[in-house]
Amino acid sequence: MRRRAGAGARPRHDSFSILCAVSEILALIVLTNVHTAATGPPCRTTKAGVTVGRFQGLVGIALILGIIILFSRHRHAIKWRTLGVGLALQVGVALLILKWETGYEALKWVSDLIQKLISFTNEGVMFVFGGLVSEDNGFVFALSVLPVIIFLGALIGGLYYLRVIQVFVHFVGTALNKIMGTSKVESVFAATVIFLGQSEAPLVIKPYLSKLTRSELFTCMTGGFAAAAGSTLVGYSLLGAPLPYLLAASVMNAPGSLLIAKALMPETEESVASVNTLKVKDTESKNLIDAIGNGALSGGRIAVIVGCLLIAFIALIAMVSGGLEWFGSLFGFEGWSLEGLFGILFAPLAWAIGVPWEDAAQVGNFIGQKTILNEFVGYTSFGPAIPDLQPQSVLITTFALAGFANLSSIAIQIGSFGGLAPDRRADVAQLGMFALFAGFLTNMLNAALVGVIMGL
């Protein structure tokens, strides 16, 4: 049974404390702008040729931190250590890849290794599709991206059976548990979604799902929405997004999701699922070959879902845009489209997280497509536009889109969590929109942080 902890305890943090915290962040922004005005122009060019508005993303960071405190279900129960350490871990990862050459080169080496693995997919594709695979046909999504998802699904299935992935999951999960003060279940799940994604990761904590507190369940759901994991991560790179940045975003999502979730829904109950050792093993596969086969089939299901959603959503975008264009022409307005509407709605957010204003409408469109429709739709539009965007816009957009936080994912989580623990299905459905909001904020916080660090 789950019970409330410290029900009669006096709140440690009142509204005045929260107001002071937000005021300090805003004061930092003001002081930064004053310093900038006194010491130099509002932007500079980095060694990579990136012109960055100094600390523009601090607006987005302050906005997001203010939102999670304002909308927190139990402000008095917020553990500031979790917020502070989570933010520090995100900043640390961003510094490693953006400001430490050795760190970036190490990530680039991993990226190149993954690209080499991807190239082996061509052998299987050419055998199955033969002459359809040709450079003369150019980039064909169904033959270039979807087979990679299947291959990496098989590879991850094999590594999972051999317990290679579990070593990383145990290490990262234990580290997050000790450093951030989150429960073992939450921490392991946050590490697991780096590899397995939102639909497969709940299997890892299946024995504990029924025992999770409401806060723990919300945190796991947030981790799923914020994640950009496994085979789909490489799929984004094939659409044009830089793979090193995608890998960094995937890692940053782990502490980021814990930070956001534990601020929006702090723990007010005593966890009974926080075991000392949480065993993670493949119990469904009989042997390595069976595990690889199951992984391939799992990847195949994801590939089919991705293909179906892209066909449906891109067609719907065209239909709605055509309707808007026709409706606008009746009143003398030309060029109305769904993309333009997304751009208008999300442009202020894009600017707040560090995107230059001249690119804000375009990036806002990508964020809107990713959130309302699907992240693959967002990356499909983002890839061809990369040459026309400024380098910092490409960096920030890559991080902003790297997550499953979209409306269709709510149904996926209800199916995955609810299927494994039917007694929690109602809770999952109830928390769905709020957890989606938390996952979205996680992705935006990552994007704002890397924008600020790039400007240092």
Stretch-by-stretch model annotation:
Residues 251-302:
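Long, contiguous bundles of hydrophobic transmembrane helices that form the permeation core
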Residues 108-119, 167-181, 193, 207, ...:
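Short amphipathic alpha-helical coupling elements at transmembrane boundaries
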Residues 170-204, 271-291, 338-342, 370-371:
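Juxtamembrane inter-helical linkers in multi-pass membrane proteins
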Residues 40-145, 290-293, 306, 310-318, ...:
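N-terminal alpha-helical transmembrane segments of multi-pass membrane transport
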